[in-house]
Each structure stands twice: as structure tokens, then as C-alpha cells.
Amino acid sequence: MGGCSSAFAVSTRMIRFSRGRVPAAILPVTSNDEPCCSCSPENNNKNNDGGGGGCDGGEHQKGKSWRRWQYRRCGGGGGGGGGRKNAILGDAADVKTAAGFAERYRLGAELGRGEFGVTRRCSDAATGEALACKTIRRKRLRRCRGDAEDVRREVEILRRISALGAGADSVVRLRDACEDSDGVHLVMELCEGGELFDRIFARGHYTERAAAKLARTIVGVVQLCHENGVMHRDLKPENFLFANKSEDSPLKAIDFGLSVFFKPGERFTQVVGSTYYMAPEVLNRSYGPEADVWSAGVILYILLCGVPPFWGDNDEKTVTAILQGGINFQREPWPKVSPHAKDLVSKMLDPDPSTRLTAKEVLEHPWLKNADRAPNVSLGEIVRSRLMQFSAMNKFKKKALGVVAKNLPVEEMDKYTQMFHKMDKDNSGNLTLEDLKLGLQINGHPVPETEIEMLLEAGDIDGNGTLDCEEFVTVLLHIKKMSNEEYLPKAFKFFDKDGNGFIEMEELMDALGDELGPTEQVVKDIIRDIDTDKDGRISYQEFESMMISGSDWRNASRRYSKANFSSLSRKLCKGNS
């Protein structure tokens, strides 16, 4: 597989550790950078577009990795010990002691582990029902108020949707939200049926009718959210799992960590999500629930042809493609796709949110309304093979990033927070260009103003010309994680079992086998896309290039030399250690 689909597979961003943010440096400059309130009316949260943290816990399923918590405003709750005054959920917790939790649930085998927590199989002590428990470890929560607010919001959203009963069967159910001295435990419905794309290529015969049925479920989730005042903001195939392995298993949405409450007419400015699925208005920092329909339209496009409608080999090129628009219905298999399907895709990917179909209107479109009568002719092997490689490449990167996450010590995160406060002399909560220059000069490490401006441009998410704690720490963590010689080599060695300095086909098949069961051809395709010198194996340099391409903050340095950017990071760390 080459061309568009190869670039798509290689550059798909793994954002588990930088939760869905596009560097400000690649976004268009707008005048809409003032934060909008996305508060929940119930908790009176004044968090200014507040989603963007939450816990991913590996989406509580095997093979998933925990996403990195985003920094918010610093200097408040969320960390600390187990006393009630340091509570994260507070009165929102169903169980408030370790003894109470142990009495109600029995923890079992680990399903996934990441930078900020662990997901385990668990069971109801009274009934034996199999469940999943996502534990957000207290010691891993940063000392920023937003972390606790994000957890509470995710819990509140899941509770609101779970309370709908049978009407919310397409959303994973939250059973309990518990808190003890160790952290927060979210006990949820266990989904063991696998990812959306895995099910598609496992069946062997994939048709437009099958795509229509899946799309109807996905858009149904969007409609359910919008009816209940919730905007999802991170719709993508990886956030949907099958409940079980049966042929008629329901498909369920499983991740609401970026979701927010909204009111009619409310506009949001925070750029969150996954780049391939972002609507133009999200990139232009003025959006509402219509953006979810766009994301669902991107998923539908991929379901029908195996590649995204707008793509690039890095975030900058992808953003440019999205803003330029234009849908390609010429390449295979589009000539054999029905006119009704193409009509719906076009209307969901309308660049104007005011004329884009609503979720309700999408469900009333003839193609989805009559999904059971959509063409039952195979879309062709090319679609299945594209989806298969996309899924396999994702899992390769997830495994590698999981190793990176495990090797990032808590103390390093704390160090960056303390660094921010030392440099924030006026306690404004923001670092200006002068703050950064002065902070380095005082510590005997003067840095050219152009390099300071580079850091500001790369890290300034909201475009206000300063770095808040979240922005400052996020960019430094990513620079350090991806440039520090300690982390990526450990991830490489995880795959290079024989230690010969190369990842070979057998090693990659063994590493991915438990989760994917990939065919030899799929693994060959992955290696071919990464193997730039065409020797049939992956060197460390090629592995590093794969990990860097298309990834959040690592691409923030694309306009500058990597050496200069890393040098600035080292000076900042050394000057404030």
C-alpha cells in the first residue's frame, strides 16, 4: 500500500500522552482567542472551555495506553494525600474509603497501564459481574486545579448519560466513581469485543451496508450527547469498542475525557481532539456541537474508503488540507459507492457549520434511515487492507509510547511545575517573553530572544502571547520525552528482542500478535512505510523518525532545527533545577 494510505498510516498521531492539542504554531491566527465558558450548569465550573484532561485508563480495555494529563491552572487541588480536604471527587464519590471499595469490588488482572494509572479487570463482589476499573493514581496527579475538575466533569458526563438507561446502550456505562487515599477508581462496563477496525477486517467481507450500520451507531452517540447538552470533541474510530465478541455485539463509545457541557449558541475556542478528525472551525478556534458531526463524517469517509479525507505527513500539512477543503470522490473505491452515501459524506463534511447537517438530520438522511437496505456489495480488498494497516500502525505506536510513558518519573513533572512558578515572578499565572528571558539570565543561562520566541510560538495554545503552566509544562515534557536519549531507546529495545539494533518482521509480529494477530503482509507494509533505506528492517533512526512524525509537540519544532529546540529545553531545565 502506498501513496495517501501509507502516509496516513505512518503519520497518524498517537495522542495518549498529549491529549488532543494542536500546537498553536500551526494554527491560523484569529481574533477569537478569548476563552469561552464551557461550564457545567450543575457544578458551576468556571473553567473556560474546560475539557481536555480526564483519564483514559487505556479506555479500560486491553492494549490501550493512558493518555497524558493536561496541565491547567497551577497551584491548587488535585494532588496531595488522602485526606478529605484533598479530595478529588469529594461528595461526587460513591465510595470514599479503600475498605469500602475493597468490600464492593474484587480487582483482577491488569488490562492496560500508562503514565498516570492502570486499568484492571474487576468484578462485583456481590454478583460476580465482570467490570473494568480505571485507577487514576493520586501521586500522579499534578498540582493543578484543572486535573480534579476534569475528572469530576468526566464523571458527571458519564453519569448523566448512564442515567438514561436503555436509551444510552451505545455508550459505556459508569458503574461507580470511587476515591480513596490511592486515587480515583472509575468502575465501568467491560468491553471485550475489540476495536472498530479490527472487527471489520476480521470479517473478511466488508460492504457499504456494514459501514452504514456502524455510522448509524456513531451518529446516534453524537445525537444522544447533543440532546443532553454534551459535546464530545474527540470522536475517532479508536474511541469505539464492541461490547463483546458476538457477531451482533453493540458498538459503544468509551472515552469522554475531552467532552464538555454546552448551552445553545455557546462557542468554544480551545483546540482539542485528534487532528485528522478536527473540523475547520475548531482549527479557527470558534466552534460548537457541529464539530462533532464533522468528526463523524470523517469516520464515515474512512469507513467507506480506508483513508481520511484530509491528510498530511505531519500536523501542519493535515491542518492545511482541512482548511483548504475539497473531498476526493475519484479514487477507489468511491466510483462503486452509492450516490446516497457520497451525498451524506458531503453534507457532513460541509466546511460551513451553519449549513452542515445536525446529528438529527444525519440520522434522517435516506442512506442511514434505510441502512439495512444499503448496497451489500463488497467495497473491495483495498479498503480492508488500508484499515488493517492503519490499525496495526496505531498499535505499534501505542506500544512504543507506552514504554516511553512508563519511564517518565513523577519527579520530572513536579520539576517543571516548580520551574514555572520560579519564573512567574508576578504570580500572574502566565510567562511572558520577558519572564522567560529574565528567568534564564538570572540563572546564568542567557538564551537568544529568537529561541525564546520559538518556545512561545510552539507552546502558546490559546494564542495570547504568553505561556500558562499547562502550556509551559506540556511543551517541555514533550521535547524531553522525545529528544532525551533515555526514553526512545528503551522503547526500541522493547521490540528489538535479539539486541542486534534492528526491529525485524518476526519481532514486530510477536510484539503485536496478542492485540492484533496481524498477517505477515500487514507487518511487511508497516516495515516498508518506516524502512527508508529499504533493507527490510527498522533501524533505531527509522524508529525514531516514525515516533516523531505526526506527533503533537514534537512537530512544534518543524520550523526550527531540532538541535536548537532541544538546546533551549536543556537550558531551561538546567537553569531552574
Swiss-Prot record:
Residues involved in Ca(2+) 1 binding: 424, 426, 428, 430, 435
Q: Which residues form the Protein kinase domain?
A: 105-368
Binding site residues for ATP: 111-119, 134
Means of activity regulation? Activated by calcium. Autophosphorylation may play an important role in the regulation of the kinase activity.
Q: Membrane topology type, per the record?
A: Lipid-anchor
GO CC, sorted alphabetically, is: cytoplasm; nucleus; plasma membrane
Q: Which domain of life is it from?
A: Eukaryota
Where would one find coiled-coil regions in this protein?
none
One Pfam family cited in the UniProt record for this chain: EF-hand_7
- What positions does the entry give for Ca(2+) 3 binding? 496, 498, 500, 507
Q: Where is the lipid attached (N-myristoyl glycine)?
A: 2
PANTHER family attached to this UniProt entry: SERINE/THREONINE-PROTEIN KINASE
The entry assigns this protein to a family as follows:
Belongs to the protein kinase superfamily. Ser/Thr protein kinase family. CDPK subfamily.
Q: What does this protein do?
A: May play a role in signal transduction pathways that involve calcium as a second messenger.
Domain comment from the record reads as follows:
There are 3 contiguous domains conserved in the CDPK subfamily: a kinase domain, an autoinhibitory (junction) domain and a calmodulin-like domain. The autoinhibitory domain (374-404) inactivates kinase activity under calcium-free conditions.
Protein name listed in UniProt: Calcium-dependent protein kinase 22
Which gene is annotated as encoding this protein in its UniProt record? CPK22
